[in-house]
Structures are given as structure tokens and as C-alpha cells.
């Protein structure tokens, strides 16, 4: 039958929860999941035929971690942990206090 499409303001939260569970399950199974946000959404939408009314949040690669010594030098140099913000910049108590 007909299903009415309506905006779902919690879709990003739901996508994050789905990603977290996917990452946990792949780790449990001995695999590795790597989420990526830096990709060409328009190209992906075209190649996979994703309708315009669907949001593409991220892509995920699932596989086994390989031997880093086999990477080309340019890629090997990128294999370092990224900087993380201190918790004080991410967590607040009480009223919203960021950017004010």
C-alpha cells in the first residue's frame, strides 16, 4: 500500500546508532569497519541510483586490516591517529554553552 513520506528529524541520530552497532558487530566478528564522510555524494547517488529524497550520511568500508608495511609511502604517512578535541569542548553541563 501507500506509505506517506514525512521528514524524520531523528534520522541522523538513527544513522549514528546503526553505524555504532555495525562497527561493534564487525569487530566482534574479527573484521574492521571504517566510516568515511569525505566522498562524492552526487557521484555515489548517481552510480547507486539513490533517490533524491534519501540522505546519504556516510560510506563504510568493511574488511581486514592489512600489513601497514605494504602501503605505498604516501599512504603510510597518513596512518597516524587524528587529533581529538578535549572533552571540555564537547561536553557541557546545564544550558547550551558552545560558541557563545
Model-based region annotation:
Residues 1-100:
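Acidic, surface-exposed loops and disordered segments
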Amino acid at each position: 500500500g501507500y506509505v506517506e513520506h514525512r521528514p524524520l528529524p531523528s534520522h541522523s541520530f538513527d544513522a549514528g546508532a546503526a553505524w555504532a552497532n555495525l562497527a561493534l558487530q564487525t569487530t566482534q566478528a574479527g573484521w574492521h569497519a571504517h566510516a568515511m564522510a569525505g566522498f562524492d555524494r552526487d557521484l555515489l547517488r548517481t552510480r547507486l541510483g539513490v533517490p533524491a529524497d534519501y540522505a546519504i550520511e556516510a560510506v563504510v568500508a568493511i574488511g581486514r586490516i592489512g600489513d601497514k608495511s605494504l602501503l605505498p609511502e604516501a599512504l603510510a604517512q597518513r596512518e597516524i591517529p587524528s587529533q581529538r578535541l578535549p572533552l571540555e569542548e564537547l561536553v557541557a553541563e546545564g544550558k547550551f554553552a558552545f560558541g557563545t
